Amino acid sequence: MPKKRINIAVSGLNAIDSPGPGIPVIRALRESAVFDVRIIGLAYEALEPGIYMHDLVDKTYQIPLPTAGADHLLNRLRYIDGIEQLDVIIPNFDAELFNFIRLADVLDQEMGIKTCLPTMEQFEARQKVNLEAYGKLHGIRIPKSKSISRHSEIASLAPDFQYPLVVKGKFYDAFVAYTPEQVQTYFNKITAKWGLPVLIQEFIHGQEVNVTALGDGKGGMIGAVPMRKQYITDKGKAWSGISIDDKKLIEMAGRLFETSRWRGGLELEVIRTDEDVYYLIEINPRFPAWIYLAVGCGQNHPEALVRMALGEEVEAFESYDVGKLFIRYSYDMIVGLDEFMNISTQGEL
């Protein structure tokens, strides 16, 4: 049976030391058994490595930063669609999802571009500042947390919080602080990059495990692959990991999909204590950067997401391979200045 030709736009091309999910999502789509894909990259900066990976990305366009707002993004997507006739868009950054969710209906009705995203209500409910209430609603243990917006609130964290504690940005970054002085340092660092509020979270001793999963928007779970980090960078990112047999983690993801009716991909970051108690510490509302491990384990989540976006009925994956490793590596590309100039000055390559 011939593969279906389809044009898919993908963001998150920053394959750096803190990589975006875009390149592994594209690799998964390139290996699709049902789609013959033309990949359109959506980039924010001229030095995102994926722009120059021409074996993976057929054409790249710069798009406005999320802070520019949904209207500017829509105008740029109209221009891109006029050239590329996009079928599906897969956004891969937390910070851009707000705009893409707002535009989902317009993209579909005006241009016929499909997405597979949660609702705005679902997206906001799992924000870090709302996570504790979210856990209570869905019957999942969450570490105690509090959002702060002023330096003066740091001194009053005790006795409610014991040190060490975790200081988190509203989109990215998390630091373990052992003193109030360290909290202040991380507060300044995070607000300069991501703005307010800053989240203070109880530190849970244990082993971090993660699961990438895909929901159908009707309460069902299409697939889930749990992973344990084997090597972690100084930014806390997994440089290698292994798929594990963890039924409790999969059950947690299934329960969340059942009660929230989440549509699309997500990642759950969980701490498993020595007493085998599971605490959900974060919900990332998109595929993780290690999503290609799921493909290697027999579950192609990006392909399934595209099928759902196109309105197809997708059967749930029944199994995955345990004991498969992903090992990330750095790679030097040689790029001509003319290519860099094109993306920098013309906004496309």
Annotate each language-model stretch with its function.
Residues 230-238, 284-298:
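Glycine-rich phosphate/pyrophosphate-binding beta-alpha loops
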Residues 5, 303-349:
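Peripheral (often C-terminal) accessory segments that flank ATP-dependent C-N-forming ligase machineries
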